[in-house]
Swiss-Prot record:
It comes from Aeromonas salmonicida (strain A449). Keywords: Aminoacyl-tRNA synthetase, ATP-binding, Cytoplasm, Ligase, Metal-binding, Nucleotide-binding, Protein biosynthesis, RNA-binding, tRNA-binding, Zinc. This is Alanine--tRNA ligase. GO terms for cellular component: cytosol. It comes from the Bacteria. It catalyses: tRNA(Ala) + L-alanine + ATP = L-alanyl-tRNA(Ala) + AMP + diphosphate. Its cofactor is Zn(2+). The gene is alaS. Zn(2+) binds at H563, H567, C665, H669. Its EC number is 6.1.1.7. Consists of three domains; the N-terminal catalytic domain, the editing domain and the C-terminal C-Ala domain. The editing domain removes incorrectly charged amino acids, while the C-Ala domain, along with tRNA(Ala), serves as a bridge to cooperatively bring together the editing and aminoacylation centers thus stimulating deacylation of misacylated tRNAs.
Length: 874
């Protein structure tokens, strides 16, 4: 019975709804509050806390069709996608779940009833496996369901340890775990392969379609298995696999959704070979890329963004392989939205963003793709009998041309060649070490000071307090005291000084003691201890001394204003650009602030102005800035934004600014948004692929900036003899005049070059009856060589021309051959002959070619060598 993919999905959810299950929407591909996961890769991910007992739901039975991505991390088999029948970066997992409700009997019954009743699969085509010692599951299959015992396979511990089996599931080394039973479909004896547990089990005849996990134990650290008080069920069935069976095909790429995408991709790139594996790659990759972007992931050079970038670039490379000459990948997103309309509401809503991001990413990559492929072809041509591309070459392709290592591997595998992964990783480590060395400044206090206590911070409510010195450190070594002029780090019993964190700079101020003053120039953290860096201005300071710690209040207030505005800016950027915007970093100082965020293109002036208006509107609204400490889950339920990658304690501080912004933040803030006064963006730039940076000023700093800009405009207006209202027109007039003069200058240079070319005709010689001109020109403009060459070829009618000019350490070469002689002499070969002798290389067409070099002193000998070379060819 044929069923479309959409019909199967709907039938699955409806069947389990009728069995009392709550139909739950697919969660985002970005896991919520689970830093252990790169992407959502299974249906149970969104219920993990429910299974662990940390979360409760209003239902105890659920069913989903979960979007999943498996690429990167331990699931990195990207190179196989498109080349096998069932490898994908994106797939849908159908699942039903019991949270302490039903267990083995009902779970097995539901699965069998759906497969044989709803889908009407032939029972004789189904085979099941159980864990070797799970007699309960075996008996349910044999005695209650009626599966013949010869079609029930017991699978033992086949992974080298107790309870390490294909049929024993565990969440991690400890915690919930249990046996599972799997259902396989037999595609028939015309396909090679054996049943699970046999030597031929890796064949394609028997395909797993449903895995039913019975969570019945809690694994302890010592390996003992304690029964769970409320056993649960977690199941998963790949939608693409069951669709292939229901549609009578063997490969997932032959099902309806993939065929529609493959046909559309073929139409876009202009190919008629629908069996080409590159079309499979593209059809798979548009699914993962589009849904990842719709769920807020942007291409970048790290983490999830880098996995997305790798997938996009692999798809682009396969498109070029098929003959695509223009950007194409983004055009497939609309067809995907049509095919996934039943479950793709997020994709449809974000379709304009998805297409824009894919187009921009492809445009950026194709600029270097062809050059990188040329380099790779060069390497392959000179590889000889070797079967591995050196790691240094793989790294150069990554570092210079943006080729992820697996993309290079994908290209060369077609020649049955591999890559040196160890060598590549070694080069990556060298680069990381260089970056770390280049960015290292000052002292890493976490490494130098091994402090094992926590300093209480009192600075939210006060800027000064009496406290005591519990430690003094000079150059990382603890000392008992200081004298005037000495630099050191001081640790207090408690402090009102804010230590740098969350992008906010550390406080400055003074520590006052009876006969001395310690100037605090910076405040940092060493572990959980707060340390005060500075120097003793006068007097002495000893360990144990009572001091008055006084924060520079004016500076703290300026920093607080700038910190508060980062929250408003974050919210405004998400409102103006979309929910994909997330904070990537910040620096909040007293004079200005900067804010790094995920976005794929530069902001237009109109967008910058809109963001400024949104922020300033919230400043004028004069919202109360309220802070509250609550537990992490309650904070997230209240809508507080958490930054991915940040580690949070169980209790967190929530900063709320009206209804506009709610974030988790430990920094200091203004009392009301109106205290900020005024917000002005002074710069916007890209700092990495997929990451933009805004620099801005607030309050008095913003007013000072506007005054400075006004003064500069007035000064510029005076220079062009205008005023602030006519300056743009005046500058435009000057630029137009400058362009006209540049054109006249180029025309004059061309005339002079033509004249010089005429003068060179007296140096023409004959080699084997053909005219040849070889000349070194002193002080000639390299830009004029092309015009000079054309003039000489026209005047000579037939012949070979080679011109060289040099200045400082640079050589410029150009060669020309008239069309009647290109069968004997190629300009590209001629210019390359000389270039190699002067420390360079070059190339071009048979009739004209250019090159460069770095050894002017070698030019005379190189030109002389041309005579004998031409004698052999003319």
């Amino acid at each position: 019975m044929y069923m479309s993919t959409s019909e199967i999905r709907a039938a699955f959810l409806e069947y389990f709804r009728s069995q009392g299950h709550q139909v739950v929407s697919s969660s985002s591909l970005v896991p919520h509050n689970d830093p252990t996961l790169l992407f959502t890769n299974a249906g149970m991910n969104q219920f993990k806390d429910v299974f662990l007992g940390a979360d409760k739901r209003a239902y105890n039975r659920a069913t989903t069709s979960q979007r999943c991505v498996r690429a990167g991390g331990k699931h990195n088999d990207l190179e196989n996608v498109g080349y096998t029948a069932r490898h994908h970066t994106f797939f849908e997992m159908l699942g039903n779940f019991s949270f302490g409700d039903y267990f083995k009997q009902d779970a097995i019954r539901f699965a069998w009833e759906f497969l044989t009743g709803t889908l009407k699969l032939p029972k004789e085509r189904l085979l099941v496996t159980v864990y070797e010692t799970d007699d309960e599951a075996f008996n349910i299959w044999a005695n209650e369901v009626g599966v013949p015992v010869e079609r029930i396979v017991r699978i033992g511990d086949n992974k080298g340890a107790a309870f390490a089996s294909d049929n024993f599931w565990q969440m991690s080394d400890t915690g919930p775990c249990g046996p599972c039973t799997e259902i396989f479909y037999d595609h028939g004896d015309h396909i090679w392969g054996g049943p699970p547990g046999s030597p031929e089990e890796d064949g394609d005849r028997f395909i797993e379609i449903w895995n039913v996990v019975f969570m019945q134990f809690n694994r302890q650290a010592d390996g003992t298995m304690e029964p769970l008080p409320r056993p649960s069920v977690d199941t998963g069935m790949g939608l693409e696999r069951i669709s292939a069976i229901m549609q009578g095909v063997h490969s997932n790429y032959e099902i309806d959704i993939f065929q529609a995408l493959i046909k559309k991709a073929a139409e876009i790139v202009g190919t008629t070979d629908l069996s080409n594996q590159s079309l499979r790659v593209i059809a798979d990759h548009i699914r993962s890329c589009a849904f990842l972007i719709a769920d807020g992931v942007m291409p970048s050079n790290e983490g999830r963004g880098y996995v997305l970038r790798r997938i996009i670039r692999r798809a682009v490379r396969h498109g070029r392989k098929l003959g695509a000459t223009d950007v194409f990948f983004y055009k497939l997103a609309a067809e995907l939205a049509v095919q996934m309309k039943d479950v793709g509401a997020e994709l449809i809503a974000q379709l304009p963003l998805v297409k824009r991001v894919l187009r921009i990413e492809e445009e950026q990559f194709v600029r270097t793709l062809d050059r990188g492929l040329l380099l790779l072809e060069d390497v392959l041509a000179n590889l000889g009998d070797a079967k591995v591309i050196p790691g240094e070459v793989v790294f150069k392709l990554y570092d210079t041309y943006g080729f992820p290592a697996d993309l290079t591997a994908d290209v060369v595998r077609e020649r049955e060649i591999g890559i040196d992964e160890e060598g590549f990783n070694a080069e990556m480590e060298k680069q990381r070490a260089r970056a770390k060395e280049a960015s290292s400044f000052g002292v890493n206090y976490n490494e130098v000071l091994k402090l094992d206590f926590e300093t209480p911070f009192t600075g939210y409510k006060q800027l000064s307090q009496k406290t005591s010195v519990v430690g003094i450190y000079k150059d990382g070594v603890e000392v008992n005291g200081l004298i005037a002029g000495e630099e050191a780090v001081v640790v207090l019993a408690e402090t009102p000084f804010y230590a740098e964190s969350g992008g906010q700079v550390g406080d400055c101020g003074v520590l006052k003691v009876d006969d001395g003053i310690f100037a605090v120039t910076d405040t940092q953290k060493a572990g959980k201890a707060i340390i005060h860096k500075g120097y003793l201005e006068l007097g002495t300071l000893e360990k144990g001394a009572l001091v008055e710690a006084v924060v520079d209040g004016e500076r703290r207030q300026a920093v607080a204003l700038n910190h508060s505005v980062t929250h408003l800016l974050h919210a405004a950027l998400r409102q103006a650009l979309g929910d994909h915007v997330t904070q990537k970093g910040s620096l909040v100082g007293a004079e200005r602030m900067r804010f790094d965020f995920s976005h794929f293109e530069g902001l237009t002036m109109a967008t910058i102005r809109r963001v400024e208006e949104l922020v300033n509107a919230q400043i004028r609204a004069n919202h109360d800035i309220a802070t509250q400490v609550m537990d992490l889950e309650a904070a997230k339920s209240a809508g507080a934004m958490a930054l991915f990658g940040e580690k949070y304690e169980d209790d967190v501080r929530v900063v709320r600014m009206g209804d506009y912004s709610t974030e988790l933040c430990g920094g200091t803030h203004a009392k009301r948004t109106g205290d900020i006064g005024f917000f002005k963006i002074i710069a916007e730039s890209g700092i990495a692929a997929g990451v933009r940076r805004i620099e801005a000023v607030t309050g008095k700093g913003a007013i000072d900036f506007m005054h400075q800009m006004g003064e500069q405009i007035e000064e510029a207006a005076a220079l062009v003899k205008g005023d602030q209202f006519s300056i743009a027109d005046k500058v435009r007039q000057i630029l137009d005049k400058s362009k006209m003069m540049e054109r006249e200058l180029e025309q004059l240079k061309a005339k002079l070059a033509a004249q010089a070319g005429s003068d060179l005709l007296s140096q023409v010689i004959e080699i084997n009856g053909q005219k040849v001109l070889i000349a070194a020109l002193e002080g000639a403009d390299p830009k004029s060589l092309r015009g000079m060459l054309d003039e000489l070829k026209n005047r000579m009618k037939s012949g070979v021309v080679l011109l060289a000019t040099s200045s400082d350490d640079k050589v410029n070469l150009i060669a020309g051959v008239t069309s009647d002689l290109t069968g004997k002499v190629k300009a590209g070969e001629l210019v390359n002959l000389v270039a190699q002798q002067v420390g360079g290389k070059g190339g071009g067409r048979p009739d004209m070619a250019q090159a460069g070099g770095t050894q002017p002193e070698a030019v005379p000998a190189a030109l002389q060598s041309v005579h004998s070379w031409l004698e052999e060819r003319l």
